[in-house]
């Protein structure tokens, strides 16, 4: 069924939607409420309807980033397709959907509240990035302190990775990278 992911930036709303679509083996459409209009919504719904004529598969997933930015008519355009199961809607928002999403659409969606990432989550993300990123895993990186890194990331995975990229990029050549509070705050 359709749902809305509500939480601060960088907590994984978009990533979760991709994981859901991939694990369910569903066709996946993405729209950004910032740059899409009613015409774009109708095109995706029409594609989903025509694809369903030729397959007996499950309904595709339509992910709408920043769904709170859609106006009433844009949200109205989704109603029929969500209600009849033509699409499964996954909306992502940083704003309270009770105030930003129209009641008829909200009543057809489960709302999941996501919280800012905790220090342990950020540490896991940092460890994984250092081990699996194609550039980082080939650099000599010594993580001495993480307080400033985690404080500046403020529970946001995207910020953490951006700060990490800036810090590592400040060390030119084959110089070993030292991540400590001073380096993070001076970059």
Model-derived regions, located:
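Walker A/P-loop
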Residues: 1-31, 46-49, 79-80, 84
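Short glycine-rich substrate-engagement loop in P-loop NTPases that contacts/grips substrate
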Residues: 28-61, 72
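Conserved AAA+ ATPase "SRH/arginine-finger" region at the nucleotide-binding site
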Residues: 32-34, 110-123
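Short regulatory helix/loop adjacent to the ATP-binding pocket of P-loop NTPases
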Residues: 79-80, 96-110, 127
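Helix-loop-helix "sensor" segment of P-loop NTPases
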Residues: 126-146
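Conserved C-terminal helix/linker of AAA+ ATPases
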Residues: 170-187
């Amino acid at each position: 069924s359709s749902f809305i992911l509500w939480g601060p930036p960088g907590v994984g709303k978009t990533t979760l939607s991709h994981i859901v679509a991939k694990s369910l083996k569903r066709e996946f459409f993405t729209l950004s409420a910032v740059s899409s209009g009613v015409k774009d919504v109708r095109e995706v719904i029409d594609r989903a309807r025509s694809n369903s004529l030729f397959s007996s598969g499950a309904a595709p997933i339509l992910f709408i980033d920043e769904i709170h930015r859609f106006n009433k008519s844009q949200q109205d355009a989704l109603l029929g397709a969500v209600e009849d199961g033509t699409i499964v809607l996954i909306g992502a928002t940083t704003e309270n959907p009770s105030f930003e999403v129209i009641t008829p659409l909200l009543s057809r969606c489960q709302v999941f509240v996501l919280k800012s990432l905790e220090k342990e989550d950020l540490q896991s993300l940092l460890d994984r990035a250092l081990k699996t990123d194609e550039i980082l895993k080939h650099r000599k990186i010594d993580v001495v302190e993480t307080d400033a890194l985690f404080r500046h990331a403020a529970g946001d995975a995207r910020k953490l990775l951006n700060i990490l990229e800036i810090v590592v990029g400040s060390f030119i050549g084959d110089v070993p990278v030292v991540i400590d509070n001073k380096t993070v705050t001076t970059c």
